[in-house]
Amino acid sequence: MNKTAANNQRIMPIVKDAFRIHANPFPWKKAIGSGFASGFPVLVGALAGHTDYGLIASIGGFVYLYAGGESYKKRALKLLLVSIGIALSFGLGTLLSGMLWMMAAVLGLIGAAAMFIFSALGIQGPAPMFFVLAFLVSSGLPADPSQALFRAGLTFLGGIFAMGIALIGWLWNKHGPEGAVLQKTYHQLAACLSAVGTPGFHNAQHQTVLMLRTARQTVLGKGNRRKKSRHDERFFRLLEKADDIFIAIIHFSAETPDRETAQIEKALRQTGDMLANARVFNTFQINENESEPRRKLFEEINEVLYIASGRFDKQLDGEPSRLPSSFYFLRNAFDWKSPVLIRALKYGIVLFAADMFALAFGFARSYWIPLSAAAVMLGTTVVFTLHRAIQRSAGTVIGVILAGAILFFKPGGVYIAFCIAALQCLLEMLIVRNYALAVPFLTANALVITESMHGGAGAGYFMIARLTDVAVGSVIGLLGTMLLWRRFSTKRLPELVRNVIRLEGQFMEKLLTGQIADEHKLRVSLVRLRDAYDKALGEFPHANADALWPAISGAQHLGYYLLSAQAHRRPSAPFSDEEINQLRAFFEQAEQSFIMKRMPADIQVPHVPHYPRISKELSALYSGLRTAFEK
């Protein structure tokens, strides 16, 4: 009885999390655009007397879902490549229809390749989902290899149409995406500032770093080969200042928040709200008796208000920096230690196994099994995958009933077009609140499209078959996540912590000897460590990764304070060789503690008079290591 109660205590929070409603605003524009991109090709096909052609083109309409917050130039290139990829997937599905082994192998390859590319480049969205759907749907059509090019062409046209809808905002606001991402960035900076002195500061700090990275990817290009416009100049400066303000907030976080902190937070939010317009803002008056961290934060805020007003004369010599090429990220991710490569391999293997299982056992419309596995496998950990499986199973029941009700009346082409548009619109409206709310419309939409292509089966048979397929596919996806590289992130944690501690030791030594350290390398390592820790918490079986949090938290805090210290460098006092050796010994002991999984030996924690906050964080790291590994 006690064991059953314990199991219930573990399972119930997972189920509750799976159905938790998020208070996100409804994305009206994206929902309407998505519905139009999917439904209009079917309407055109129906009016032309070829509903089947319109249905094939509507698969390309899913390209619209890959539009993110990037600039219009980057969005055009991305959606063009996605259109080509989905069209190729549809064509390959037609060519390989009926070739059991080849179909499964190519499906796994498509899924793995798409997952690898999207993850390595950090592209948000459905990732490989619609590449997989295009291949599977086309493989279920009547086998006719001679139609491969024609069907791929229709899919590509649907994708180009969807791309046009996604780019239409360029006509009246060419810099809309850049302004939107900077608004979010300054709102996140305000949230980070408001979290100072609270238990949520560490998480707010991490979320701000991720938001700054997204802003850089949106605003910056691969170079600066042409003259910048006034808009570009303003965005580059605001991006630079966002980074400076984040470092200033870290510097300021050593102080106790007061009423004035709330005023600064309000100013940051207002700045974000008004970034779309060059409007004059009132700046803060800085008192002579302000503390250095507070004065620095005021100065950075005033500069942002000045730039946001459009009042700057001297042009930047170039962009704040250049983004590395896409090949740089792909090359770095192609490594056995890379979570990106492992996730892609896991995805491809499970798709191959699911398709082989479905084909070997002769399931009607066998593609629903690997398609369900593909949807479930989008979860990054076992817990998230279990969430997806629960959400998909519950939502599919409603979705199948809804699709059955629509198809029961055998609607004509025009009505099918309106149904697809409405279902897709509702799907995009609700998915931001909870995936479970969107699954009924996702399932119904996919069923209406695919069953309208095939037809033939009775409503009762079709409903039972789809429910069975989704259940089997979800189980295969969940098993794949639980069995393949199931503790990959947990095993990486010691190496990642050791790397962060080593970089912090090198960084601090350069800081104290008047040299310039590599900020980018340390910041990337801090983000990777936190990402691996979050994933380790969701792995199965649970490895008590949360017990390591005191040490990981100490390393994270120290890293960000070191970044702040370099940005607000003070005149360095002479640091003797003996003190440098003591510092090295401390960091070596900290590294060994994590690698050997034991408490660090009794050692004197270095004291740095010019940086009292760093001295405090060194003590916190030492205490965190002792807490994490105490017996």
UniProtKB/Swiss-Prot annotation:
The keyword Membrane applies. It is a multi-pass membrane protein. The keyword Flavoprotein does not apply. Signal peptide: none annotated. GO terms for cellular component: plasma membrane. It is found in: Cell membrane. InterPro entries: Memb_transporter_dom. The chain crosses the membrane at residues 42-62, 76-96, 106-128, 152-172, 344-364, 366-386, 398-418, 429-449, 464-484. This is Uncharacterized membrane protein YvaC.
